[in-house]
Amino acid sequence: MPFAAVDIQDDCGSPDVPQANPKRSKEEEEDRGDKNDHVKKRKKAKKDYQPNYFLSIPITNKKITTGIKVLQNSILQQDKRLTKAMVGDGSFHITLLVMQLLNEDEVNIGTDALLELKPFVEEILEGKHLALPFQGIGTFQGQVGFVKLADGDHVSALLEIAETAKRTFREKGILAGESRTFKPHLTFMKLSKAPMLRKKGVRKIEPGLYEQFIDHRFGEELLYQIDLCSMLKKKQSNGYYHCESSIVIGEKDRREPEDAELVRLSKRLVENAVLKAVQQYLEETQNKKQPGEGNSTKAEEGDRNGDGSDNNRK
């Protein structure tokens, strides 16, 4: 853990510095100097901690995303100045953990940590799906607007997953997490996206803008995927963040319905093919019989006509 690597005294004030021993060898002094440099770098790293990556739970339920778009449009109808403050399509997510990854090697370590996280998450969920229901609107000091995660047992499970993720990444030596308490939320707008708003007199998100959605139920999202995303790299064409790696939660359970659907589809295709073949066979059989049937009919008509002629002659 990166914070544990710093001596505990560094967090509690300056430690007592032992007096230099004049008999200490030059090599020992150099080793001590290297260790002090290492501690200073660690302290500087903590001070300069600027998260640039995060773990994301993507929100893909159309009911939720459509509801958020309706909410955003409702707000913009009341105040068009907020257009640039809105979170774009495809970017809706829950931030599970933030972290700092400074180079490609650290990104690779982060990818490994995410892979190690998967069995821990599945153990927490005990083979069950985690449904995340969203209801109502909230803000962070009037600066960030978000859809609330409804109360329930799912919150405890998500908090445990977030804490496990933080521990897993820190044990890999990654600076991760925040000092503030983790509060899962689904951001739909933030004023920091549009700094010019302050000059236009917009200093906070007014509650009246979203009052009709204050208790609105947006829907449920199943936790099925966790992504390691970049805050700074160019977003994907669908609007979602640049993704370094992903894990799928309960992958086996999610694939079974797909396999079952494929089986059902295959059966329907086979049944349709058989039915079509039978119909084609019957049509061909009828076509072969039709010429003979036609001659017989004509003969019968001829006999009837002949009988009629004889009768006339009589």
Swiss-Prot record:
One of its GO terms (molecular function) is protein kinase binding. InterPro entries: AKAP7-like_phosphoesterase (IPR019510), AKAP7_isoform_gamma (IPR052641), AKAP7_RI-RII-bd_dom (IPR019511), Cyclic_Pdiesterase (IPR009097). AMP binds at T95, H185, L186, T187. It comes from the Eukaryota. The keyword Glycoprotein does not apply. GO terms for biological process: cell surface receptor protein serine/threonine kinase signaling pathway; modulation of chemical synaptic transmission; protein localization. Residues 261-285 are annotated as: RI-alpha-binding. Residues 1-46, 281-314 are annotated as: Disordered. Its main location: nucleus. Coiled coil: none annotated. Expressed in oocytes. It is found in: Nucleus; Cytoplasm. Residues 262-275 are annotated as: RII-binding. Changing L269P: Abolishes PKA-RI-alpha binding. Keywords: Cytoplasm, Nucleotide-binding, Nucleus. The keyword Lipid biosynthesis does not apply. Residues 24-37, 298-314 have a biased composition (Basic and acidic residues). Binds cAMP-dependent protein kinase (PKA). Interacts with PRKCA; only the cytoplasmic form is capable of interacting with PRKCA. PANTHER family: A-KINASE ANCHOR PROTEIN 7 ISOFORM GAMMA, RNA 2',3'-CYCLIC PHOSPHODIESTERASE. Probably targets cAMP-dependent protein kinase (PKA) to the cellular membrane or cytoskeletal structures. The membrane-associated form reduces epithelial sodium channel (ENaC) activity, whereas the free cytoplasmic form may negatively regulate ENaC channel feedback inhibition by intracellular sodium. This is A-kinase anchor protein 7 isoform gamma. It comes from Mus musculus.
